Design a protein with these regions (language model features):
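Regulatory cytosolic signal-relay segments
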Residues: 1-18
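Beta-strand-turn-beta hairpins that frame and shape the catalytic cleft
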Residues: 3-6, 29-32, 99-102, 144-147
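Acidic loop->beta-strand submotif enriched in PP2C/PPM serine/threonine phosphatases
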Residues: 17-30, 123-161
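Catalytic core of PPM/PP2C metal-dependent serine/threonine phosphatase domains
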Residues: 20, 49-119, 129-130, 136
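Membrane-embedded alpha-helical signal segments
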Residues: 28-31, 35, 46
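Residue-level marker for buried hydrophobic side chains located in beta-strands
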Residues: 36, 107, 149-151
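Active-site-proximal, acidic helix/loop segment immediately C-terminal to a metal-coordinating Asp/Glu
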Residues: 43-64, 148-176
Length: 176
């Protein structure tokens, strides 16, 4: 049968917000599982709209065979521009795990994926690409039974800034 994927996720709303600014999409193809995490700029309703649009666009286009360049271009052209910040912005991560053990990971402005094998933190070989002026991290690697891959939005590493955790929650601390 090959590699199977167990997926779990948790989204927490920012304090006092009704909607979460993060969105997760889970998709399946005949030979793979696809996980998409998007985080809209800001918080609440605006962030939720940006992340929902981003995750839905990426999911639909990815399933229909669009290239990464086409996906990034469509997101750039589609997201509504914030009247205050004058940008349209959402971070995203796409993780596709094939049943044969091949994995494909794309990250744009989210903290790096945590990859654990046999209790040890693994480094994933990356290829940095620039698409429409955006630095996109792209990875191709192998996974095996028992591996754990953890995607997170920047809300994770910025949790508690200036309050409980003066400088947020460092990626290395989360990985450890």
């Amino acid at each position: 049968m090959g590699i199977t994927v167990d997926v779990a996720y948790k989204s927490l709303n920012k304090y006092t917000e009704i909607l979460c600014g993060d969105k997760v999409e889970l998709l399946q193809t005949e030979d793979s599982n696809i996980m998409i995490l998007a985080d809209g700029m800001g918080s609440g309703v605006k962030a939720n709209i940006l992340s929902t649009l981003t995750s839905k666009i990426l999911g639909t286009m990815f399933l229909n065979g669009a290239t990464l360049e086409e996906c990034v271009d469509t997101i750039s052209e589609t997201l509504p521009i914030c009247q205050v910040r004058q940008v349209a912005y959402s971070t995203f991560s796409i993780l596709q795990v094939y049943h044969n053990g091949d994995a494909y990971l794309v990250e744009y402005d989210n903290p790096g994926c945590i990859f654990v094998r046999d209790g040890k933190l693994m480094e994933i070989p990356q290829n940095v690409r620039e698409i429409q002026g955006k630095k996109i991290n792209e990875y191709r690697f192998k996974v095996q039974k028992g591996d754990a891959l953890i995607l997170m939005s920047d809300g994770t590493i910025h949790a508690g800034v200036g309050e409980l955790l003066n400088f947020g929650w460092l990626w290395q601390d989360i990985a450890d």
